[in-house]
């Protein structure tokens, strides 16, 4: 099974530029075209949050149009720039998002299970997995202990050394680690948020962040370094 991960496309309404500089729609369209040229094609694509920049319905409509040429199913999860209800409405027809509550789900149609988490705190840059979300995860993993899992979430559950990003990280990574450690079938944790690639060990598995299709964050380890 081949899974391709995209992250943090930060799509805006048609014609708008991110920070008045970055044509995020053009960058995502280019990525989609490159994915469709891969041989063999991935079985699925996943996008690990910050799908759009302001959580507006027009942005999600634009995102759907940009993703429509993909030659494989695509599954999306929220990041801190997203808004649950507009996202839910935009992708409701695809049938995998829950009708209410947190945007957490499992995809059971492939040799590897996809398990998606919602780390969003509305109005905040950082993320959290509350007891309700972690209980859901524990149950989802316990329900199929023999099947390998790719876990997807926006905020990485580890410090990166980029202080300004770490201040907007996942608040309770220790609680997540306790759940993951109980379920050795978790093969990897796919994350976004950081706008660059970092991999590390976490709770007996490997967690990693994907670069953004929109723009990258400088690897500057000085405490007051700009993004």
Which positions does each model-derived feature cover?
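Short glycine-enriched, charge-decorated loop/helix-capping segments at active-site entrances
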Residues: 17-23, 123, 162-169, 223-225
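Extended active-site neighborhood of metal-dependent phosphoesterases/phosphodiesterases
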Residues: 57-142, 148, 172-185, 203, ...
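N-terminal active-site segment of His-dependent metallophosphoesterases
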Residues: 1-62, 143, 160
């Amino acid at each position: 099974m081949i899974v391709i991960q995209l992250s943090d496309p930060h799509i805006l309404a048609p014609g708008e530029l991110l920070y008045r500089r970055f044509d995020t729609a053009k960058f995502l369209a280019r990525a989609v075209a490159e994915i469709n040229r891969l041989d063999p094609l991935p079985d699925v694509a996943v996008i690990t949050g910050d799908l759009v920049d302001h959580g507006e319905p027009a942005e999600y409509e634009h995102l759907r149009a940009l993703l429509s040429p993909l030659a494989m199913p695509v599954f999306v999860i929220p990041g801190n720039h997203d808004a649950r209800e507009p996202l839910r409405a935009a992708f409701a027809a695809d049938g995998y998002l829950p009708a209410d509550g947190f945007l957490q789900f499992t995809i059971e149609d492939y040799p590897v299970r996809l398990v998606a988490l919602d780390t969003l705190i509305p109005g905040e840059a950082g993320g959290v997995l509350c007891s309700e979300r972690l209980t859901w995860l524990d149950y989802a993993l316990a329900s199929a202990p023999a099947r390998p899992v790719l876990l997807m979430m926006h905020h990485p559950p580890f410090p990166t050394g980029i202080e300004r990003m770490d201040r907007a990280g996942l608040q309770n990574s220790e609680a997540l680690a306790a759940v993951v450690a109980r379920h050795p079938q978790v093969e990897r944790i796919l994350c976004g948020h950081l706008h660059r690639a970092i991999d590390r060990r976490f709770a007996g598995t490997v967690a990693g962040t994907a670069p953004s299709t929109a723009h990258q964050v400088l690897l500057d380890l000085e405490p007051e370094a700009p993004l």
